[in-house]
Amino acid sequence: LTCGDLGLTPGLNQPRITQRVEQVLADAFHAQAAALVQGAGTGAIRAALAALLKSGQRLLVHDAPVYPTTRVIIEQMGLTLITADFNDLSALKQVVDEQQPDAALVQHTRQQPQDRYVLADVLATLRAAGVPALTDDNYAVMKVARIGCECGANVSTFSCFKLFGPEGVGAVVGDADVISRIRATLYSGGSQIQGAQALEV
């Protein structure tokens, strides 16, 4: 029995138990890689946006109210918002062609009662245009057959609390290159999810 390791394992730059749990998550969601981060679902979205975008770049979102904590991240990063109606794929394609967003954030669950878009179709439209996409799967993970990264998103983000795991731990799951950029920012022991926290996931 173990309560997990702490600090930075030489050669890994993270706790070994944390690395193992991340691999389990990646395997569970048929993804290349996963990273556990501080800050629950909001922290996961922040980490993913920072890996995909630089300050001042353009983020495409659905033409609907943006989740309040996500809006704070957008404002902190100084991102320019571009909106499109994800319910209308032709309108979405037109906005992408005209506005050339640098990345897109797609909420898996409905943002408003009238939303009817099919996540995989929206992601296919974005991928065809070469727009990197991350999905907010906070209210969908473990309640749907496939999360965003299994439907074509570059990465999915969610709180591990939604997996009945610990409060305050988030997960980013998806493309290895995006996860690698996130890991590059977690260079200190204090920024890591420690082994004991990872075991609770």
Where do the protein language model's features map onto the residues?
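Generic structural marker for isolated residues within well-ordered, non-membrane alpha-helices
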Residues: 22
